[in-house]
Amino acid sequence: RVLFRSEANAEAQKIIVVATVEGDIHDIGKNIVSLMLGNHGFKVVDLGKDVKAEAIVEAAVAHKADLIGLSALMTTTMVRMRDTVDLVKQRGLGVDVMVGGAVVTPAFAESIGANYSSDAVDAVRLAKSLIAARKNQ
């Protein structure tokens, strides 16, 4: 937890909505990623586990998210990541989506139009990189 943050830094904080996708109740990895992102200055909106694509997209809109992070531990729930990415595109949100979890691969992430993160440290690096790329557009 951040105990002190200047007003200027708080205003510049980027927002990331994170969730474990629908059907998946495994959230330890997501919780670690959320903690790491928070410690690196992101405002994390953690929706928890077993979250429907619609709820994730609604939260991204409501919180004016800069990024969305999705987690899945089971191959049977990875398809819900695709549902979320598709809904983000359908709604025209223009928000990058990061995906990760034990069963998620770079090839899968690419196939659904998302950005792959291998672990919590990589998630922080990727989030910063995606934010910087958007800033430079």
Regions inferred by a protein language model and the residue ranges of each:
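A charged, well-structured terminal subsegment
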Residues: 126-137
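Short glycine-centered, acidic/aromatic-flanked micro-motifs in structured strand/loop junctions
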Residues: 18-21, 70-72
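Acidic/polar, glycine-rich intrinsically disordered N-terminal extensions of enzymes
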Residues: 20-22, 114-115
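Short, small-residue-biased leader/transition segments that mark boundaries at the very start
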Residues: 2-3
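Glycine/charge-rich, flexible interdomain linkers and switch-proximal surface loops
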Residues: 7-20
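Cofactor-cradling patches in redox/metallo enzymes
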Residues: 30-40, 44-114, 119-128
